[in-house]
Regions:
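Membrane-proximal basic amphipathic "stem/tether" segments
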Residues: 1-47
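Conserved catalytic-core segment of nucleotide-activated headgroup transferases in glycan assembly
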Residues: 52-61, 183-263, 335-337
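Active-site and donor-binding regions of nucleotide-sugar-utilizing enzymes
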Residues: 40-190
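C-terminal amphipathic helix plus adjacent low-complexity
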Residues: 1-6, 10, 337-382
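A donor-sugar binding/catalytic signature common to diverse glycosyltransferases
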Residues: 106-129, 275-319
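Catalytic binding pocket for nucleotide-activated donors in carbohydrate/polymer assembly enzymes
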Residues: 264-267, 294-363
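Donor nucleotide-activated moiety binding/catalytic core segment of transferases
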Residues: 90-105, 255-297
Length: 382
């Protein structure tokens, strides 16, 4: 039901406008009667779905440094019962909005105000966002005009490209740009061969196998927001015949995907969607296969081969849109068919493709090391 309501708000401009005006007014009035707690920090990751990403990196930093022990950290989740060791509140409930009005510090990778505008004077808002965008986001998506980050005090950017995108997509203020990169990606810089080997061991990968991480992005709902299914045109039995002697595949669906159709898991194709830390999977992987996901930019930090399997590119381009043509920028252009993808993997020149990935990384990512500490100091002033 919650997903359905969110879908309606996103896709019905009239209902969205009424909701935004009325509820923003209600919460602004409520805010007049709720005193700000200078030691309360509200965290939200992926709209309350997970305990991960850059907000978790910031939280972990605060827990590890004595100077931040005096802060009370509250996490908002869709299902707080999954996180018994954290202080939590259920997102999109009256208690959540009271907490948001009370907390002096907001930290998220999506949004805190839930499409509304009720931030009070003196509250500090850090939005890391959750990746560099290939596909249109925010107000750049057809039919959307509801993103307004003018209340965000600090917005993480990875480079000049992000700054251009966020200006149109979010109406972000240039003064809010925190030019530090993403805290979640900090551990991907300078990964050693020993760390890679240890991660593969933790994941149970045989020593004689290479790892392909396949991580497609989500697709828009076809049933009015009831579900977000994905059925990639993939025949993993053929992949096994062609690649099984040398590789294993880790299949990771986007967090917003509700169901993966047509995929049978075994020793060759392993389910990785439920694994909590995507960075672990990237560290272990020798090759990334994706499509329009921000994971391509994250993985590029490792300077390893990337393949773009854009089987529905023409349709996706028409329905969603992208900021640039994949074949103009991606390190290995794109593959439109399964046969082409398998052929390229079998013929890969690892060194050449790694160099191509580095050029791709350097075009889009200018900042990254020290991101977590920089975010904490910007938000808390110490």
């Amino acid at each position: 039901m919650r997903q359905r309501l969110i879908y309606i708000l996103k896709h019905n401009a009239a209902i969205q406008a009424i909701y935004r005006i009325v509820m923003s007014f209600v919460f602004r009035v409520m805010g007049l009667f709720i005193k700000t707690d200078d030691n309360l920090v509200l965290f939200v990751s992926f709209m309350g779905l997970n305990f991960n990403d850059s907000p978790k990196a910031i939280y972990d930093y605060m827990q590890a440094h004595p100077g931040y022990k005096g802060y009370r950290c509250m996490w908002a989740f869709e299902d707080p019962s999954k996180f018994p060791n954290l202080e939590t509140v259920k997102i999109d409930t009256p208690a959540y909005f009271r907490t948001a009005l009370k907390a002096k510090y907001w930290i998220t990778n999506t949004n805190i105000e839930r499409g509304l505008h009720f931030k009070k004077k003196g509250q500090k808002y850090l939005n890391t966002w959750h990746g560099i965008a290939l596909k249109y986001i925010g107000n750049d998506v057809a039919g959307r005009n509801d993103f307004n980050f003018d209340t965000v005090d600090h917005l993480c950017v990875c480079g000049d490209y992000d700054e251009r995108v966020y200006k149109s997509a979010f109406r972000a203020k240039e003064s809010s740009y925190l030019r530090v990169g993403l805290p979640r990606n900090e551990e991907l810089w300078n990964v050693t061969d020993e760390e890679k080997a240890e991660m593969r061991k933790r994941l149970g990968i045989p020593a004689d196998k290479k790892v392909i991480l396949y991580a497609p992005t989500w697709r828009e709902s076809t049933d009015g927001g009831k579900s977000y299914e994905i059925k990639p045109p993939i025949h993993f039995d053929e992949w096994k015949k062609e690649l099984g002697d040398e590789y294993v595949v880790l299949f990771r669906a986007h967090h917003q995907t509700t169901k993966v159709l047509g995929v049978q898991y075994d020793e060759f194709v392993r389910e990785a969607s439920s694994y909590p830390a995507v960075n672990d999977l990237m560290i272990a992987a020798d090759i990334l296969i994706t499509d329009y996901s921000a994971i391509a930019f994250d993985y590029s930090i490792l300077c390893r081969p990337i393949f773009c399997y854009a089987y529905d590119y023409d349709t996706y381009l028409a329905e969603r849109g992208t900021y640039f043509q994949i074949d103009d920028k991606y390190p290995n252009k794109s593959c439109r068919t399964e046969e082409e993808l398998l052929s390229r993997i079998k013929e890969i020149d690892y060194k050449t493709e790694s160099m191509n990935t580095k050029r791709f990384r350097d075009e889009f990512i200018q900042y990254g090391i020290g991101a977590t500490e920089a975010c904490v100091k910007a938000e808390f002033g110490k």
